[in-house]
Amino acid sequence: MLRTVLEPYVGSPQRLLDVGSADGPSVGWLSAPHKVSLDLDPRGLRPPAGICGSVLALPFADASFEVVGAFDVVEHCDPEDVALDELARVLEPGGRLLLSVPAYQWAWSGHDVANGHHRRYTRPRAVAAVERAGFDVVRATYGFTAVFPAFAAERALRGVQHRFGLGGPEGPADVVDLPPVRPGIEKALLGLCRLDRRALARRDLPFGSSVFLAAVKR
């Protein structure tokens, strides 16, 4: 789904930075002759192109890259504006920022806490934050729309359980590791995601559990 929305804005860069997803969803399609992957966690990083570091203090000179990808990264960063300013700093003028963030603060749960999130976003909130950092947003849309009813129901159930003390306390494994999905359910969810991909190839979607955004540095 990320690829459907954001790959058209990659172009043919020579210098590209992939922040926070050394072994993540962008490995197969976000590429360049000189690609650098940066992550706080050294696992999955392969020197010399894999660098351990923080988006709050990127170890690169100004205007080092033509494209920067940051998928499910900015929600981990506090202060948010420092992270976005750093992403802007290492991009050359006219460079492209591609990012994704989780949607809707009302969907906040122990999963967010355990994974080190500081916030969730609406589309307007994500657009405003990126524009303040000196970008012009060229596309911003929600994703995972077809599976959103199931996502919303699961988060509502978590909220009720937490409020009334049902289901016992959440341990780290409960909130970080996703529970196994039955093959039939997994097949249905993948089918719904394929519907999203087809729709996103033609238009933006009005709601979903993630926000996908492409922007150009002024």
Where are the regions that the model predicts?
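Conserved N-terminal segment of class I S-adenosyl-L-methionine
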Residues: M1-A63, V67-F71, V82-L84, P179, ...
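A short His-aromatic
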Residues: D72-H76
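A structural helix-start
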Residues: C77-D81, V101
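A C-terminal cap/extension of S-adenosyl-L-methionine-dependent methyltransferases
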Residues: V147-R218
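Conserved S-adenosyl-L-methionine
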Residues: F135-T145
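A short glycine-rich, Lys/Arg-flanked "PGG" loop and its adjoining helix->strand segment in the class I
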Residues: D81-R96
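Short, glycine-/aromatic-enriched active-site segment of Class I SAM-dependent methyltransferases
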Residues: L97-R119, R123-A128
